[in-house]
Amino acid sequence: MEVKGIINAIKKSMKDKDYDFVPTSKNRSSRHKYGLTQYDIEEFIASLEEEDIIKGPEVDRDYPDEELFIFKKEIIKDVKFYVKVKYKNNQIKIISCHEDE
């Protein structure tokens, strides 16, 4: 999938609330640290654009037949979040969404 395709898939998935969000401790910790709601995260991810991508498509080392896309974008003033997604089974899977390190 090309970058434009993943952006369109992300926007559609967020609009339809049809996505899988992996609940890692790092994802939860960043959300709580900044007082962000699930709605805030959905809006943020839906706002990703082509210029926010830093890597991708690239092969998922754990699942070589799948592609990953990595984004970085400011979510609130002076705070960038790292977002890693893949498109699997006609659905966006959000693997990471946390403060950039």
Spans of features found by a protein language model:
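Compact soluble domain cores
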Residues: M1-D65
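Functionally constrained cores in energy, signaling, and assembly domains
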Residues: R31, K72-K73, K93
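Basic/aromatic recognition patch in beta-strand/loop cores that engages polyanionic ligands
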Residues: R61-Y87
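Enriched for short, Lys/Arg-rich terminal
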Residues: V79-Y82, K86-E101
